[in-house]
Amino acid sequence: MKIQFLGAAGEVTGSRHSVEVMLPGGSRRFMVDCGMFQGGREASNKNLELFPFSPKDLSFVVLTHAHIDHSGLLPRLCAQGFSGPIYCTSATFELLKILLPDSAYLQRADVERAERKQKAGKWRGEMPVALYSREEVDLALSQF
């Protein structure tokens, strides 16, 4: 078994772990959590990085709980090709039906606010990028 820590190692947010299990005749890869990094520009840049594997190669995802730093990149993972099931408790799923759409809304609002400020000449620095759309949230939620 190989475990790759893709976040929450040396920091608090961004919990995502890739697990590869060697089986007779091949291997299987799955993820435990798929969380968003939180905490400023550096964290935002980490969220934009590609996964170090093809999401299409994942068999499934297991979520430990609903917090965004454990679930917030699921829509991005699904948009990049993951099509397997996502497993969690029913309570976690109920919370995700609120948290993930809200996350997409807040990201879009940040982009729109920055665009307005830029138009008015009041924006300095990098423009924020929405990690995913409401449609990508709906795609992820359909995989539970």
Question: Which stretches of residues belong to each language-model region?
Answer:
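Short beta-strand scaffold segments in enzyme catalytic cores
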Residues: 14-20
